[in-house]
Amino acid sequence: MAMAFCPKDQYWDSSRKSCVSCALTCSQRSQRTCTDFCKFINCRKEQGRYYDHLLGACVSCDSTCTQHPQQCAHFCEKRPRSQANLQPELGRPQAGEVEVRSDNSGRHQGSEHGPGLRLSSDQLTLYCTLGVCLCAIFCCFLVALASFLRRRGEPLPSQPAGPRGSQANSPHAHRPVTEACDEVTASPQPVETCSFCFPERSSPTQESAPRSLGIHGFAGTAAPQPCMRATVGGLGVLRASTGDARPAT
């Protein structure tokens, strides 16, 4: 006969080839089967204890009376109120001590972190000030650069604009050099006449002529003109080359 599945409170006996109750073997010291069941049976026999299947151990009901399971209901209900209230009262000072400790730790932490917060605010103020200074320096640099570029684009005041305009507007500005030379050569020549020259008595006289431009275009210079000498009745007469000489009287 094959081995059959037995319930939790029984085990399979190979000699009998049947399921046998574990209660018969729990009293034996050398029992190897039904260990969990035997622990459960023995825990139920003890008052104020219950068997926890998750832990696989016997747990006292005193530690779970506030949140006790159903197995400990009869024990926690019969428990004296003085003992039931004693544990919460003992626990309250501990909670108070924990609160005091937490408050003290919070104060200590606050005292420790207080200067850190102040230091961070000072650092923030310092960084803001430095940022404003850097912005001001950058703006000044941009203004200086703009003024430099503006001055660079303006013409240099080496030559005044007035003479340029007057030279450009003058009628002789665009005339070629040949025309100017023609004007110089075409200007009226000074006239010199010699009349009644008496070489044996006095030097010939020179009439005043208007000051005009010479050969080279300088004022006050007179171009010399050759005179032709003629004898009229024993008198020497000089004639100008221009043909404006007057005969002697």
UniProtKB/Swiss-Prot annotation:
Cytoplasmic-side stretches of the chain, per the record, are 150-249
Organism superkingdom: Eukaryota
Q: What is its main location?
A: membrane
User: For this UniProt entry, which segments traverse the membrane?
Assistant: 129-149
Look up and give the organism this protein is from.
Answer: Mus musculus (Mouse)
In the UniProt record, the gene name given for this protein reads Tnfrsf13b
Q: What is this protein called?
A: Tumor necrosis factor receptor superfamily member 13B
Q: Which GO terms describe its cellular component?
A: external side of plasma membrane; plasma membrane
- Cystine pairings recorded for this chain: C6-C19, C22-C34, C26-C38, C43-C58, C61-C72, C65-C76
